[in-house]
Amino acid sequence: MSDDDNLAKKLTPSAKTRRRRSSTRPEPLSRRWIVRLVMLLIAFLITVTLGVLAWGVSEFNARGPSTEPVTVVLEKGAGVNAIARQLETAGVIRRADVFAIATRISKTAKKLKAGEYQIPAAVSARAVMHILIRGETVVRKLTIAEGLQTAQALELIMAAEGLQGDLDAGGGLSLAEGRLLPETWHYKWGDSRRDILRRMQEGHAQMMEKEWAARAPDLPFQTKDEAVVLASIVEKETGKADERAHVAGVFVNRLRLGMRLQSDPTVAFGLSPDAPLDRLLSRTDLRTDHAWNTYMRKGLPPSPIALPGRASIQAVLHPLTTKDLYFVADGTGGHVFAQTLAGHNRNVAKWRRLQRALTTGGD
């Protein structure tokens, strides 16, 4: 091999050298741009995500759109999406999607409680969420007045908004007269009518146990049921608190002496046990014999004639000590009492003169 050939061989790179040099050649321009674009896209997505999160948090904490309290009823079994849409439709929150997503992220979606809520004005979606988690539902009131008949009380229970179900007897419940405690009862939307009826019945039983245990000695009746019967008569005879014990004392005296009670409300109940009698009693009514006519029959009638309140129960268990045997209306909402029939007749005559004067306008 000539010197020229050796020189050419030295100056010509080998295949191995060419491969090594080609492997260190700079990457094509297009690949670098792809990497940069991907990195820019990731940065953009992160920025957008953070922006959306910041907006969502701001929206979740912002004041609500309502300008006054809003009442909403959330049904049992409703999912978070349905609840969120209902709140948005009612004007409680601005966006249902923000509320639904926030409750899911905070893992409180399944903690939202059904019921009736009164959401304050302009509260944030976050505040609404916590109200629903705590179950701060509306507490309703149902007032059963003393002196109502059981049928009237049942009508009020059936008409009470938010209560559910029927009022069939059974399961320990009684629809008998005088077995319910007339008070103001609290309940929440969705409570059953049977439950509130049971509470009234249990309240009456507990009250009677307590009051009966503290009763005065030597009363002319032997059972709690008899006490309720007499208390119901007192309840219907007078609405004045300071008269109850006095009226009870008169009836206790008459029972001890074997006299007829001669109570108009008992006669009226016998004529119309399912609703108040819608007319005045006549002389014929007083002479019509039935189990509740205490003008015709001695002793207590067979059942209460109304729902007696606690005060009337206490009055018959602690009657006023008196010699009075009679009373009649005095024209002012109260009564005038007498020990003798002669005195009573004079009081009745005064009452009738007053009635005539009122009827004729004083002429």
Predicted regions and their residues:
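Short N-terminal micro-motifs specific to bacterial/archaeal maturation
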Residues: P28-R31, T71-L74, A90, I119, ...
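N-terminal type II signal-anchor transmembrane helix
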Residues: R21-P69
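Short, flexible segments with low predicted structural confidence
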Residues: A54-G56, A125-R126, T284-D285, A315-V316
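Short low-complexity stretches enriched in small and charged residues
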Residues: P26-L29, L37-F44, P69, L74, ...
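Bacterial extracytoplasmic/cell-wall-associated proteins, especially those involved in peptidoglycan
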Residues: G79, E155-Q164, G171-D363
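N-terminal Lys/Arg-rich, disordered targeting/topogenic segments
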Residues: M1-R32
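Signal peptide-directed extracytoplasmic domains
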Residues: W55-E211
